[in-house]
Amino acid sequence: MIRIAILSFAHYHANFWAEAFLAEPDVVLAAIWDDDVARGTEAAGRFGVPFVPDLDRAIDACDAVAVCSETVAHAPLIERAAKAGRAVLCEKPIAIDLIEAARIGAAVRDGGIAFMQSFPKRFDPASHELRRLVMSGELGRIGLVRIRHGHFYGLEADFASRWYVDPARSGGGALLDEGVHAADFLCWTFGMPRSVLASASSALGLPVEDQAIALFEYADGMTAEVIASFAFAAADTSIEIYGSNGTALLSGVDLASRDISKGPFLRTFTRDQVVREWTPSPLVPQFKLGWFHHQNAIAFAAALRRGEAPPISLDDGIRALTMIARAYESVRSGRRIEF
């Protein structure tokens, strides 16, 4: 039996993790800790789990922790858990910056613990099919990838008071919070880029950027465009991949498009087709099915049960953050940044 404690409900994804852990065989959600006692007590009551206000006692009560705090708290919480030898599941992004990410890396290595970075798109069959289309060569040589990822919460009145828009606690705005999903897909599928040119602004007047665009250039000539926003009232196509032999378009995989996009969600075209029209796929993105953020928790628990390395690593988290950190450097300097 694996005992897991959730450390903080600051990020709403903790609710999905709790649901997943409670449904998993041979897993016990042993404790909830939160530096906000009212928030932690409410979550514990809702899920029927003990609230443990003392962090060390919460860590002692478990075999593994799931960290879902404000991003700035990731490093200190992981350091405490790693020192106690506890495995860690960490909400994205891994840290507010690369210095904090290095702290986490040192703690994980020194503690010799299992670490899993949360990137839910890694478990979506739609993501795997896009990656297969690239890796198989069906689309030919890839010249351009466009990823638009964002939501509409920035348009709601209370969003300006939430920790997500406090740079001291979140580390950044849409480019970090939303863009890191795109960065991970690019790293996973194409590897690290050669350079980036980026721009960001706060069209809504938030303390962090609510709109951002980053152009990543790869050594083979491919360009990847990432557009991130907190202010998409609605959207459709989320990922576009253009190759020398074909195109793939995917919709419904971000909050801006999830509820408004209609199937087919994945469409492809290859130049060898007799009829020049889209070929629809029957795949429905996991995000549309409502069992999306749960997959990280399920995979984490499964890896611990089997005694295997988690499927998304510390290095995966750091690589995606590195892409975003270099993009921020480009925003600040106004020039292209080499990796």
Where are these regions (language model features)?
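Glycine-rich phosphate/pyrophosphate-binding beta-alpha loops
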Residues: 180, 227-235
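Predominantly a Rossmann-like dinucleotide-binding segment in NAD(P)-dependent oxidoreductases
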Residues: 121-205, 334
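Rossmann-fold dehydrogenase core element
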Residues: 103-121, 141-144
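C-terminal glycine/acidic-rich active-site capping loop/insertion
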Residues: 240-315
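N-terminal Rossmann-like dinucleotide-binding module
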Residues: 1-46
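Beta-loop-alpha module in the N-terminal Rossmann-like domain of NAD(P)-dependent dehydrogenases
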Residues: 36, 47-107, 292
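C-terminal helix-rich "cap/oligomerization" subdomain common to oxidoreductases
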Residues: 1, 64-67, 299-339
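Hydrophobic residues in well-ordered beta-strands that form the structural core
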Residues: 53, 89-91, 115-117, 226, ...
